[in-house]
Amino acid sequence: IYMVKKEWIDKGFVDEPIAKELDLKSEIRELCRKKNAVIMAHYYTEGIIQDLADFVGDSLALAQKAAKTEADIIVMCGVHFMGETNKILCPDKKVLVPDLNATCSLAESCPADEFSRFVSAHPGHTVISYVNTTAATKAVTDVVVTSSNARQIVESFPSCLLYTSDAADE
């Protein structure tokens, strides 16, 4: 049993010292095996995290991998929206985001409450959001797109579209 310290919650991560004799990588791999957990890391994470991960990719590839994993626990080393996306795709799995301070400026640039009001003020439109949005923003959209399929999806609708966040490269 692990005790959660308030300072860890305040910081958003655990930064306790690690004994030098501890083989942390082996300990993590063994814990993942025991707990049936998979570690997924975005390309933006540090190399040491990517080396430990079972799968490394962009947000779309990570979401696709999460949807297919048989693991009970997904450790998503990335930003909030990636963990949220994994939870949406895998509601019966436990999804952990190790660094609660890891945010995406693109996702943060579209507050869900403001976007919801904008959508309400423009009825009759198909609402499209980019994958780099929060779950709350995705909840008021009809279609979620990625940089690889945005053009095809947008062109498939006749007109009257609302689109949030730009399709910046990942």
PLM regions: where:
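Conserved small/polar residues in nucleotide/adenosyl-binding loops
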Residues: 163-169
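Metallocofactor- and cofactor-centric catalytic cores in central/energy metabolism, strongly enriched
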Residues: 4-85, 89, 98-113, 117-128, ...
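Donor nucleotide-activated moiety binding/catalytic core segment of transferases
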Residues: 145, 149-151
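Short, intrinsically disordered, charge-balanced linker/junction segments flanking boundaries
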Residues: 154-162
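Carbohydrate-active enzymes and regulators
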Residues: 93
